[in-house]
């Protein structure tokens, strides 16, 4: 029996396309990566207000951006290795929780030190979540054609985060 005949005998309610849960998983991973990249650049818009409200010095204000980038870049490889050792999903969730909690603290910061410290923690969350998210895509999409599409979607949405 050929494949075309087998496909024509499937029940009408059975899904014939790609598994939607995988694409939903990709949407979650891409949305989080969008937020991680967005968080690097979105602060620049708020810097004058942050400087005024929290009475930052000029050099101190640079640490609002640099703290995040330093931790994210500095621990990116470690985050990837930890996700290999302890599981990508586990590290992704840990990174999201760390990032989210630090974001709340950033929003509630009442001093320059509190804001800078929480930006360092946000960068650490990014270093955990980012590599784990990228590592989950090949697991969700074992077929090379679908994987390339998924990586394109993930990368494109992540790049959009830097434009805001």
Where are the predicted features?
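Transmembrane-helix bundle of Major Facilitator Superfamily
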Residues: 2-164
